[in-house]
């Protein structure tokens, strides 16, 4: 396919630039391949991975408190949040489906290509000077998002307590 090699070269340069930027800000990464970066968790940061519905709830709470943190999204429908390392996942979140704390392992970091598509930033770390959110802040927001039923009608961040009907509400 004409142009494919030039595309791969440009994308490879983008991945290498992202790796340098992560490393310059103390985020440990390794190149898994020419188009995949792995963020190493457990020392400088851990990563909380949640389903997108919970991620929208977390973002809504953070937005309401005017807090900006990095957020990545995967093509399989999960979002992840870099958090301060060393905290254990609270019991309520350990029991929640598809909530995973990555500590001491590796996770594909933007702009990585994975089998189902691309991992990308919803909020890039540069938007908050590569700050890592306090684990307890994100865990608390995640616990609240799990406890609330997230609106599935296409309104990102819209949420309401289970059993409450929202009429004419817009987030």
Residue ranges and their predicted role:
Residues 98-143:
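Conserved catalytic-core surface of thiol
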